A protein has these predicted regions:
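Beta-strand/loop-dominated core regions that host nucleotide or nucleotide-derived cofactor-binding catalytic loops
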Residues: 3-53, 57-115, 121-123, 129-174
Length: 174
């Protein structure tokens, strides 16, 4: 397993408090990639291993993960709970109501269900899926096409789902 996809049997290991300065580079990468301000000053920060992923917890909530892409590059991204706490307009893919039940079962996202997306998305980017109506985060996955193709094409897979509302990471009680 490369760690590009989550596995059901992963456990939280090596959970430890960290100082902000020790994870500042990781937080900066995340802030610049998504155009957000994490504002974690004064928060209780922890790191933990979750399978091959490194997880950042802010006040006991897993808000970010560091993982390897299918191309073996290090990627830092918000979890779905992270997107609830830090709304963002970058790297989003917007789906219609019909796509939601499939995503919630861990299915990959087909382009037919995609109605809007960040045009800056490149093939291979980690992206987040939100619903068209409420703009709530639903899933995270690897884009299999660039932004304009995600919006314009009518057939094929749009992204490989790796984390969705209701999965083990979402349900985690810490």
């Amino acid at each position: 397993a490369t760690g590009a996809n989550m596995a059901k049997d992963w456990q939280i290991k090596k959970r430890r408090p960290v100082r902000r300065k020790n994870i500042a580079p990781l937080l900066k990468d995340l802030e610049s990639a998504l155009g957000i301000d994490l504002a974690v000053d004064g928060a209780f920060l922890e790191m933990a291993d979750y399978g091959p992923w490194k997880m950042v917890l802010v006040d006991r909530v897993p808000v970010a993960v560091e993982l390897m892409s299918p191309d073996d590059e290090r990627v830092v991204f918000l979890t779905l709970r992270g997107f609830l706490s830090y709304p963002c307009e970058k790297r989003f893919v917007e789906v219609d109501h019909g796509a939601i039940p499939f995503l919630m079962k861990g299915a990959d996202c087909m382009v037919a269900g995609i109605h809007n997306a960040d045009e800056e998305i490149k093939e291979g980017d980690l992206v987040w899926v939100r619903d068209q109506t409420h703009k709530r985060p639903l899933a995270i996955g690897w884009a299999t096409k660039d932004g304009p193709s995600l919006i314009g094409e009518l057939k094929g897979k749009g992204l490989k789902n790796i984390h969705w509302v209701g999965d083990e990471l979402w349900e985690m009680e810490l």
